[in-house]
Amino acid sequence: LKVCGKAIVFGMQESAGLRSSGHMRFFILFLCVASLHARDIRVGKDVLTIHQAIRVAEPGDTIHLEAITYCDYAGFYGKKGAPGKPITLDGHGAILEGSEALEPAKWTEVSPGLFKNDELLPRLDDAITCRWFFLFDGLMQRMGRTSKGKSAPYKRPDELQPGEWTFIKDPSREKPPSKQTFGTFYIRLAAGVKLADANIFYPVRSAGVQFGGDNAHLVIKNLTATHPYNDGFNIHGDCRDVVFENIRAIECGDDGISAHESAQYRVDGFVSIGNSTGICDTGTAQTSYRNIFLARNIGFDLYFLDEGRYAITNALVLSSAQNPFSTTGREKGDCRLALENVLFRRLVEPRVGVIALNSIVTGKRCTFEQLDLKITGSATWEKSVMNGKATATESSAVGADVQTLLKLTPPDFRP
């Protein structure tokens, strides 16, 4: 199937994908040779789905995707390679698409151009709806809302303009103590436009790449996550020796990438554009990022919390978020962030970054433009420049290597 000229491979349940006896025999044979040696597992050729490929992969194996768009996600739940023999997912430029086309038959026209749906997803809660968006003709419409930061109130249905949407909660359907919520989504089209012709997509997956449980010795590289209702790369649990290389998170409902609990990983090559938050790491996570580019994020650009240990080296941040930079720790333990060779360039009105209590930031060769910092925690700067002035008494403070960092800008990026 092709959508907008791109090849699409839809994820499917194993039970559906293996119904034919021929597929079943091949799949069993594939499992039998799994332990013989490191293999190349090609999704679409050797196995039908990304899920199947991850399930059968053993230490040393490489899962290969194609440079196409997959309406699917990559979930790692208790998956482990071995020291020196990681399991690798190589996207080869693949896109993991979190949205799907709206189904006109499931919507009711309540007045000319105004449509509603009472059960858009099987389950909703406030964490989902606060991240929600629709895509109208490929353009992301958040309605001024973001999961982290200030959000516009929902409009009344009669206030909607063409290309807008709203959500009206229905508390009468809720069943405490369940956090599940209910309500109705409304969308407005221009006069005379049929819903079937409107080219509207909505998010149906929570992430592009997701971790849960204990994972170890994994490499994920060369792929893009886009349009999930939560994070592009949603990393939960206790992971060790995990590497991400050349990854991108584009227009995700919440964070481009986010570490939770005690996750440990490193990233070399990351692009985060148009997300609610560029990077948000929490808990006792230990993460490092190298060669990263952030732009057009909404709520926060960089947000580091709790008792984690975090590092960023070689970063270009083109900031337009409500909250450009924030670190905050806990009373029982501090948050620590090390910055090196970072250019933080504010593109819109100046804002204040926050280094809050129980957080410690060290910066070496950093440049901040149009950004002041409110520091109630601890900050130490070396060879760094803040709004054209050295952050210390050093006469040799030249800041970040701007010309080199500007090369991190993706070739297809337009400010």
In which residue ranges do the predicted regions lie?
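Extreme N-terminal basic, low-complexity initiation segments
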Residues: 2-8
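Short, positively charged and aromatic/hydrophobic N-terminal segments
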Residues: 8-9, 20
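Serine residues within intrinsically disordered or low-complexity segments
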Residues: 15, 20-21
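Sec-dependent signal peptide recognition
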Residues: 23-29
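Hydrophobic h-region of N-terminal signal peptides that target proteins for export
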Residues: 29-38
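Extracellular polysaccharide-degrading/modifying enzymes targeting complex plant/algal/animal polysaccharides
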Residues: 42-44, 48-227, 234, 403-414
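Extracellular beta-rich repeat passengers
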Residues: 199-204, 215, 219-222, 227, ...
